[in-house]
Regions:
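Conserved "HGTGT" condensation-loop signature of ketosynthase/thiolase-family condensing enzymes
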Residues: 1-154
Length: 155
């Protein structure tokens, strides 16, 4: 069987230890702990109140952020960094039809789903965002990355 290689061309990170590759690796090297009190939702009534949340994150495009769940925002920022690090640009130095995106999530979009469900209960279903479905389906992270990068290959 022929030996196959995996080549890392660029890196991007958004995580509890750093929101870019440099800060992430610096945090790992200095044994920074990304675990702390959960702040993204009320933990009252839950057994767990600690987690590894992303901190100090601001999506650079406020208008686009309204259409994207936080999970997609994290992914897009990490992909932008990885693409810049690699020097790859779909349509310029990479054939977009040979450039695909594979990604996944266990429950990406859950924060939007929870917020919109609460809105429906408290204010009525007419107040639910028409973008809720596109913000909560799990494959939208890969879809949003494809849109961001121009990837049109197998995904």
């Amino acid at each position: 069987m022929a030996e196959k290689r995996v080549v890392i061309t660029g890196m991007g990170v958004v995580g509890p230890v750093g929101n870019n590759s440099y800060d992430f690796w610096d945090g790992i090297r200095h044994e920074k702990n990304g675990i702390g009190q959960i702040t993204h939702f009320d933990t009252a009534g839950h057994k767990a109140c600690m987690g590894a949340e992303v901190k100090d994150f601001v999506f650079p495009d406020k208008r686009a952020a309204k259409r994207l769940d936080l999970s997609s925002q994290y992914a897009i920022v990490a992909v932008r960094e990885a693409m810049a690090d690699s020097g790859l640009k779909a349509g310029e130095n990479v054939d977009p039809y040979r450039f695909g995106v594979i990604g996944g999530t266990g429950i990406g979009g859950i924060m939007t789903l929870e917020a919109e469900t609460k809105k429906a209960i408290e204010r009525g279903v007419s107040r639910v965002s028409p973008l809720m479905v596109t913000m909560t389906i799990p494959n939208m992270i890969a879809g949003n990355i494809s849109i961001e990068t121009g990837a049109k290959g197998i995904s």
